[in-house]
Amino acid sequence: MRLTKREQEKMMISLAGMIAEKRKDRGLKLNQPEAVALITSRLLEGARDGKTVGELMNEGATWLTKDDVMEGIPEMIPMIQVEATFPDGTKLITVTDPIR
């Protein structure tokens, strides 16, 4: 299987997101890379599912709460930005204060 660099990055984000989802489901508090991976992978999947940038910006701030992550993590992630492929092209999704 031959993947471009971008495809490899997407695959790594998806894998890290799946691991973070499993840890969250087991009741573990997520660290910074896990929290970013979970939100980023959900944003990419939402774009693939046909959601709009606006919908994803709003939803992205609801997936994790302060109770889901280790102490100090919300302050470490003031914003998440990811380029996602939508049916009409690639767009930048920005989620401000993603962990509330």
UniProtKB/Swiss-Prot annotation:
Q: Which UniProt keywords apply?
A: Cytoplasm, Hydrolase
Q: Name one GO molecular function term.
A: nickel cation binding
- Where does this protein act, in terms of pathway? Nitrogen metabolism; urea degradation; CO(2) and NH(3) from urea (urease route): step 1/1
**InterPro entries from the UniProt entry:** Urease_gamma, Urease_gamma/gamma-beta_su, Urease_gamma_sf, Urease_subunit
Which Gene Ontology terms describe the biological processes this protein takes part in? urea catabolic process
Q: Where in the cell is it found?
A: Cytoplasm
Predominantly, its location class is: cytoplasm
Q: What reaction gets catalysed by this protein?
A: urea + 2 H2O + H(+) = hydrogencarbonate + 2 NH4(+)
EC numbers: 3.5.1.5
Domain of life the protein comes from: Bacteria
- This protein's record includes keyword Methyltransferase: no
* UniProt key word Transport: no
Sorted alphabetically, the Gene Ontology cellular component annotations on this record are: cytoplasm
Q: Which family does it belong to?
A: Belongs to the urease gamma subunit family.
PANTHER family the UniProt entry points to: UREASE
Q: Which NCBIfam families match?
A: PRK13241.1, urease_gam
Q: How does it assemble?
A: Heterotrimer of UreA (gamma), UreB (beta) and UreC (alpha) subunits. Three heterotrimers associate to form the active enzyme.
Q: What is this protein called?
A: Urease subunit gamma
Organism field? Limosilactobacillus fermentum (Lactobacillus fermentum)
